[in-house]
């Protein structure tokens, strides 16, 4: 019976713990995705085959 108050206190503390999903989004988080997309488009346009021009028009 001595563990019941400790268990209740722990249950009350769990919702107040900070979550990783609550962290604010910064501008630095967007940069890698944008540069990744640009790099992918550059690679696709570079590897375009001359016999099939439709493969060049991606995006």
UniProtKB/Swiss-Prot annotation:
Localization per Swiss-Prot or TrEMBL: Secreted
A GO cellular component annotation in the UniProt record: extracellular region
Keywords: Amidation, Disulfide bond, Pyrrolidone carboxylic acid, Secreted, Signal, Toxin
Modification type Valine amide: residues: 58
Leader sequence segment: 1-22
InterPro entries, per database record: T-conotoxin
Highest taxon of source: Eukaryota
Residues that make up the propeptide removed upon maturation: 23-46
Residues modified as Pyrrolidone carboxylic acid: 47
PTM statement from Swiss-Prot or TrEMBL: Contains 2 disulfide bonds that can be either 'C1-C3, C2-C4' or 'C1-C4, C2-C3', since these disulfide connectivities have been observed for conotoxins with cysteine framework V (for examples, see AC P0DQQ7 and AC P81755).
Tissue expression notes: Expressed by the venom duct.
MF annotations from Gene Ontology: toxin activity
One Pfam family this sequence matches: Chi-conotoxin
Entry's family note: Belongs to the conotoxin T superfamily.
Notes on the domains: The cysteine framework is V (CC-CC).
Protein name: Conotoxin ViVB
Species the sequence originates in: Conus virgo (Virgin cone)
């Amino acid at each position: 019976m001595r563990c019941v108050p400790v268990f209740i206190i722990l249950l009350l503390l769990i919702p107040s713990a900070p979550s990783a999903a609550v962290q604010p989004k910064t501008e630095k988080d967007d940069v890698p995705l944008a540069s990744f997309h640009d790099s992918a488009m550059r690679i696709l346009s570079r590897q375009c085959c001359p016999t099939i021009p439709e493969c060049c028009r991606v995006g």
